[in-house]
Structures are given as C-alpha cells and as structure tokens.
C-alpha cells in the first residue's frame, strides 16, 4: 500500500488498544498513578500514539476517557512540540547501515527541562523507542525514575519489556499493547485511507496485528 501514516504526535485516534486505555484510566482514577510507565509492543502497534494520547489527557487535567477534544487548548501546542510541560526524547535519524541510539546528552537535556517550573500540575516526559537507550543514556534516565520530581510522569515506549537494565524495568508500570484484530485494521484502512475492501483485508492479514505495518504492505 505504501500509505503515509499520521505521526503519533498528531494522531488523535488509537486503534484497538481499549484494554491499555482502560488500565491507564483506572490508574489515574485511583489517585495513585505510577510515575513511570513502559508501553511495549511491536513496531506500528500504537505505542507512541498511546504515549501522546495519555500525555494530552494528563496535561488537560484528565477526563472520562483518554480522548481529549480536538479543540482543547493542549492539542495544538502538543502537536507543534511547543507545550512547556511536555518533553520528548527519541533517537536521532539513523545513517545508512547504522542503528541510532538515544544520546545521553539528549536525555540529560530533557531531564533538565522537565525539572523546571511547570505551567500546570503535571509534566510529562516521553522517551520514544526507549529500547535504543545505551548504557550511558539509560543510567542518565535512571536517577529520574529513582527520585522522580513531583508532578512528573515518564512514559517510555519500546518493542519489548526485557530490553532494559533490571534497575529501570523495576521502576516502571508495564503495559503490553495487544495485536489489533484483522477486521479492525481492514475497516480502518477502508475508512481512513479509502482502501478497497479486498486490498484492506489482505494487508490486515499480513500485518500481524500492527496497523502501522499494514500501511506499508
């Protein structure tokens, strides 16, 4: 198909992860929200989309669902990368034949930013593709997970829960995102991308539960 996905920072829709959303809502409503989370799952399943979705929810002060209205004041600044209470760390673009890792200097800069005075009650640090943390960048993040500043929530996304030092894993609440049913992926392709029904069904069957992968088949 080679269709263009909506970048997670702009994507207000999350497909097929209702159990994960419900778990986050329960944790928030309990009044004892863990300060660190790991969203794990295969590439294209919606990990970063969920992280931004939950970040918008927290920055908006919560609600009945994780879906923040499109006209809410947090939506525009988050999409523009300009919300003062949201800091994002991700790997730099990889060169040919290389696998980029999250740099220790980027982690340190993000931690410095997130510790500054906020405009709201909650600040959010997203570490996207956290499985690319190397030893130095993981150690830089560890202190914030050990002694989190008040009001800071850290959201990591990764392709597996076992790709971190145990010292980091033990300080995170873990959510494994589940494969999305083929029928849901096919219907989504038809609805949002106007893909023919037979083509959508074939792509969904090959995508192994990953909407993002279905766009490239």
Could you say what each language-model-derived stretch is?
Residues 1-136:
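Clamp-loader machinery-focused feature within the broader ASCE/P-loop NTPase space
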């Amino acid at each position: 198909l080679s269709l263009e996905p909506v970048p997670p920072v702009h994507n207000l829709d999350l497909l097929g992860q209702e159990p994960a959303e419900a778990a986050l809502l329960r944790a928030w409503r309990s009044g004892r929200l863990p300060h660190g989370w790991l969203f794990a799952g295969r590439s294209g399943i919606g990990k970063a989309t969920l992280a931004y979705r939950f970040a918008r929810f927290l920055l908006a002060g919560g609600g009945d669902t994780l879906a923040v209205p499109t006209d809410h004041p947090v939506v525009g600044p988050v999409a523009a990368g300009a919300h003062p209470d949201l800091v994002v760390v991700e790997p730099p673009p990889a060169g040919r034949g290389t696998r980029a890792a999250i740099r220790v200097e980027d982690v340190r800069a993000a931690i410095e930013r997130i510790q500054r005075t906020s405009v709201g009650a909650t600040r959010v640090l997203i570490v996207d593709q956290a499985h690319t943390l190397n030893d130095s960048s993981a150690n830089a993040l560890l202190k914030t997970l050990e002694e989190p500043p008040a009001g800071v929530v850290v959201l990591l996304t990764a392709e597996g829960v076992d790709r971190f030092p145990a010292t980091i894993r033990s300080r995170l609440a873990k959510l494994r995102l589940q494969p999305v049913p083929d029928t849901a992926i096919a219907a989504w392709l038809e609805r949002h991308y106007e893909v023919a029904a037979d083509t959508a069904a074939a792509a969904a069957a090959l995508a192994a539960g990953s909407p993002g992968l279905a766009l490239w088949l």
